[in-house]
Amino acid sequence: MTIPAADDNNCPSYDKVIDLIVDYAYDYEIDSPAAWTRAKAALIDALGAAIESIHTSPECAAMIGPVWPQTATVPGGFRLPGTQFQVDALKGAFDLGGMIRYLDHNDAFPGAEWGHPSDNLGAILSTADILSREALARGSPEEVISMKQVLTALIKAYEIQGVFQIRNAFNKVGLDHVILVKVASSAMVSWLMGLSRDQARAVVSHAWADGHPLRVYRQAPNAGPRKGWAAGDACMRAVHLANLVRCGQPGIRSAITTPRWGFYDVLYRGQTFELPRPFTSWVMETVLFKVSTAEGHGLTAVEAALTIAEKLAQRGLRPEEDIVNIRARTQEAGMIIINKKGPLHNAADRDHCLRYMVAVVLLKGSQITTADYQDSSPWARDPRVETLRSITTMEEDPSFTRDYHDPQCRSVANALEVTLRDGTKLEELVPFPLGHVRRPETLQLVREKAQQNLGLKLSSERVGQILDTVDQPKFEKMAASDFVDLFIPQPASSAA
């Protein structure tokens, strides 16, 4: 009988990846004007998306607020934007993270992994708000978290998540991309809390050591609303882990690399991480804003469909009668994420179906909106939509995939070819969607989107005040709690 060798129980150093994340979080000085400008846009875009979610989706609105049987107000808690709720740190992180993400209308960053960096704001802003209220309550206004610190944490969370996304395909091993929200938020919440560098390493190590969510809830046949609150779950876990370490819990030094038991061997099929560029502020500088409501890899297909719809209208043609075939060329990611046939069971299913998006736009002749994905939408039951879906084919264009991954290009191209009954073909190719860094109108459109979304719960005067405040030089010195207070509806408004 072979007797197993004794385990080596010498204390290892923290994994290099953990050191890289924490050193960046604590040391890097952001000196990019573009990053600061776009961080402000990302902030108001995410908060607008959060308010849009609770205004539009009864499902989302039902999830937020205190956990039964608590009261709606936790003294010193996080004041949840768009509502009258004041909740504890964990529920606050969950609620805001879920609200930002629920309708798939927040920003996106492409790569070997796909993700949405503004998800991290759920953990960052809720923590900053509570820490600021705590400092003010004990008479230490000099210890509040400033909005510059919030923006710093946001830029760095974007960077940590995005740089991992470039080459590390968690989807290939069946894991969901919110693993990166948990890791990035863990680092930046630790920094906001004032934890020591060693404590921050401990928090990040625990984030990697968690058993991670499966991607199953984003893919057919199980796509459903969990993909909308998964980010909130990751935000909540990041705050929870930081609080555990704050209370004295030690880290797991080789959580990633330990043979047999670590992340690489257990969950990553023995692969190792590849970080192709240093952590700077590049992700914030290049993140894709969603100025229209469509899954990121289908945004350009929607734009192409709009142009073709205009051509059909000019000819007096009806899509359901005069189109015999629709051929869509997309990237590899689009083929994996939004390529669906068969029945669509819920809003989360519809907003991840390129055929549905294209069909609705062709029939409407205008932009698809959040409401068009909901169960209550007439499009969800319109047989004409199913007719167009049934004659739509999808295929990968290798050049689109290549340009998608090229760091000098980063296109998200789609092309549509619509064949009419008389044999005429209408073709449209869109390489860069509205919201892309290469589209000069992007930041203005993001502002207009935020203005519209914030107005769903706040008065026009308050919305104007928020946008003006963010534009002021003194904004960076503003206490996070004062900023959050601007998003609480006036008493005359109904809470979510």
UniProtKB/Swiss-Prot annotation:
Gene Ontology biological-process annotations: propionate metabolic process, methylcitrate cycle
Pathway membership: Secondary metabolite biosynthesis
Keyword GTP-binding attached: no
Molecular function per GO: 2 iron, 2 sulfur cluster binding; 2-methylcitrate dehydratase activity
Gene3D superfamilies membership: 2-methylcitrate dehydratase PrpD (3.30.1330.120)
Transmembrane intervals: none
EC number: 4.2.1.-
One GO CC term on file: mitochondrion
Protein purpose: 2-methylcitrate dehydratase-like protein; part of the gene cluster that mediates the biosynthesis of oryzines, natural products with an unusual maleidride backbone. The two subunits of the fungal fatty acid synthase oryfasA and oryfasB probably form octenoic acid. This fatty acid is most likely activated by the acyl-CoA ligase oryP to give octenyl-CoA before the citrate synthase-like protein oryE catalyzes condensation with oxaloacetate to form tricarboxylic acid.
Name recorded for this polypeptide: 2-methylcitrate dehydratase-like protein oryR
